[in-house]
Amino acid sequence: MSASESQTQARLLAQALPFMQRYENKTIVVKYGGHAMGDAELGRAFAADIALLKQSGVNPIVVHGGGPQIGAMLTKMGIESKFEGGLRVTDQKTVEIVEMVLAGSINKEIVALINQTGEWAIGLCGKDGNMVFAEKAKKTVIDPDSHIERVLDLGFVGEVVEVDRTLLDLLAKSEMIPVIAPVAPGRDGHTYNINADTFAGAIAGALRADRLLFLTDVPGVLDKNGELFKELSVAQARALIKDGTISGGMIPKVETCIDAINAGVHGVVILNGKTAHSVLLEIFTEHGAGTLIVP
């Protein structure tokens, strides 16, 4: 490394210092998903980011998805994926595979990556410590022919109804980094598959997290010219949904951000997980790396 490169690194570290102080002892929930989960190099960069957050005095919590991996396993086992209104129908056999893939495979891969940095990660799901309880999701769609609203039966797809933060509070006082799969029990004894974005939002809300980061495959919220919004208020975000600037799959993502803020999260960021070290760029630099949504 040349002297100029060393000076550049030193300057970057010095610039990061006030942000390290700003987030010390703060909780940051990171929803990990999208393209980054399938790229080994990006996976290692993500693990290093989480490790550095912990070493800097931050309390990081990882929530992960795994839709493509679930689909691949169902195909491998000869089970056809069924969708209603764009949502996966999860019968008893499917939810068993979902739990196996999310809590048994993907979760442990992420834990191993973080542990390779020298930090201690622990794999969990909503069942552990009675952390999360769910109930059957209530979803409706408008029939395009009759224009009548009908209820979708998605099987064991759930919505979070209760978060007990006791276990997470204990882990926050330890050296452990929680990595959580979005699977949870219901009071009815069934296991439910929960959308990872809404699961992460529920966890962050229960903890009154300082930040909730959504790692996606896009840079953030874009205007009609394709330029990135660096920061939006909840009111501004709602107006952009109303006028069509925010559309398609970004609508439920932004609505989840708004729900998390209403639950007590101080700020939610949508950022590009395909950019190496995007978590550090967002937390420890002045301009961040995505779109910050605030109250």
Swiss-Prot record:
Any one of the GO CC terms: cytoplasm
Q: Which amino acids does the record list as binding substrate? A: 66-67, 88, 193
The GO terms describing molecular function are: acetylglutamate kinase activity; ATP binding
Q: Which Gene3D superfamilies match?
A: Acetylglutamate kinase-like
Q: Does the keyword rRNA-binding apply?
A: no
> What InterPro entries does its record include?
AceGlu_kinase-like_sf, AcgluKinase_fam, ArgB, Asp/Glu/Uridylate_kinase, Glu/AcGlu_kinase, NAGK-C
How is this protein named in the record?
Answer: Acetylglutamate kinase
The species this protein was found in: Allorhizobium ampelinum (strain ATCC BAA-846 / DSM 112012 / S4)
